[in-house]
Amino acid sequence: DPSNDVETGEYSYIGDISVKVDDWGKIPAVMGVREFYGGDLQGVMDKLDYLQELGVDVIYLNPVFVSPSNHKYDCQDYDHIDPHIGKIVEDCDGLLSPGDRDNSHALKYIRRVTDKRNLKASNELFRELVEEIHRRGMKVILDGVFNHCGSFNKWMDRERIYENQEGYEKGAYISADSPYRSFFCFQDQNRWPYNPTYDGWWTHDTLPKLNYEGSEELCRTILDVGRKWVSPPYNVDGWRLDVAADLGHSNDFNHHFWKEFRKAVKEANPDAVILAEHYGNPESWLLGDEWDTVMNYDAFMEPVTWFLTGMEKHSDEYREDLYGNSEAFIGAMKHHMRSLHMGALYGAMNELSNHDHSRF
């Protein structure tokens, strides 16, 4: 659907403007997070018969909620599908002027992502997509990015997108009186209005770290998000949890939260899968009361890639000693499979490659 395409100059992200790429064959830039090639949910809908013919059983979608980046791991609104991949029914002019990087002037972007009619229409299109996926006997898993959100998020609103929009509360960046202030940790309590001293995940100011221990309301809100999308009318079949072990500020709280998340999701949809991104030993999360399983890096992706190509996924280093080395391959598989209980092993996401690593 070309009517929802991100426009060049629609808004600014990490110091430069959004770019609509017209040449499908263009190689993405190294920092190509603001480049958009026009894909959307309608495009997925149009390809469902093809995917079914390929024998696809499950479609795992990278984040689909409102976000300024093309990867969308910096969520702006957990309750709504991004109209840029959904449906835009209310639009306007208002691209940024040349040289302007102030997103409070990005009137077109603001209309597209804050107008409730666009958000409602996009959620409805997503509902239709899930219905069509299920009608073909396939499943769909959403990506849940709950460790951090984005600086554009309406709870933070560093870009002042929601500041003057009817129906939205003040973001925590905007005002010390924001209802979302406790959702984040601020280092300087005397910098409001427009307080930039919030904690970012790995110090990234575009990825504000969510402060679960300091906000019961935040915990309730994210549990509600977990329930919402696996429940009618959306009926998604599960969650893939981004950097799941990083959530919270302590290991004890992390386990506590995922136990509560599991209860919320399974009460809403007992068959929903809870699949975590995790590097290292996941045993303590796989005791039956937190995650169901994991993305299988250690006991599949890494050893298979070493054996067949000699490439180490994380560093892209070529390891001639591992290329075709059956002893190293079998040893790695056996060693890491011991960390997965039988149910988790059978249900693990076994990938040759994904968005976080070099392609196979």
State where each predicted segment sits.
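Active-site clefts of carbohydrate-active enzymes
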Residues: 204-208, 242-247, 343-360
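Active-site-proximal helices and loops of the catalytic beta/alpha 8
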Residues: 130, 134-136, 147-148, 152-190, ...
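A cross-family glycoside hydrolase active-site/sugar-binding cleft signature
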Residues: 1, 60-62, 141-145, 242-244, ...
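Radical SAM [4Fe-4S] cluster-binding motif and immediate context
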Residues: 219-228, 232-233
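A structural motif
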Residues: 56, 233-236
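Conserved, mostly hydrophobic/aromatic
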Residues: 51, 61, 78, 133, ...
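N-terminal structural segment of carbohydrate-active enzymes
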Residues: 1-139, 147-149, 154, 201-204, ...
